[in-house]
Amino acid sequence: MRLAVLCSGNGSNFENIVRVCDQDQVVLMIHNKKECGAARRADKLGIPHCHIKMKDEDTIIQLLQAWRVDLVVLAGWMRVISADFIKAFPRTIINVHPSLLPKHKGLHAVQQAIDSNESHTGCSVHYVTEELDSGEVICQSREIAIRPDDTVETLTRSIQKEEHRILPLAIEHVKHEIQTRTYRHLLSDEDN
């Protein structure tokens, strides 16, 4: 299966995917911030990457199609993608989110968990739909205790450890689903 990973920041989830999943699976990484850690990691790992501004979403779609990408992984992609993007890749875009969905959707999920005096949080991997952080959940992490002295930074580090654990599991799950869906499609074509 051919993966593309979209990143905006440090790229630790991207690097983890490359290292844990078969290396030849990640064929491309796209980042929307020119000087980000993800680009440096891609250089170090020998993964092709390019910087594309999010307003150039059509270019991103065309590039993903040209690279024959089977699965798009949003790993720290800090932009909402459009309905057209989602329609171009139906049920083949997944996102890792730093909360136990459906709690704390959106950009500041870790801060929301702290502010709401939750005793625990975690992370989720879900299919991307037009409604923000509302797609079917593929898997969730173990609960992570929120300590009284936790800050957004310390809690984010704890959550990222779990993201590194569950994102490859979610990719394997989706890979199996895509293969099953393709096999069923081939069988139905043969029946006609």
Indicate where each model-derived feature is located:
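One-carbon transfer enzymes
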Residues: 1-192
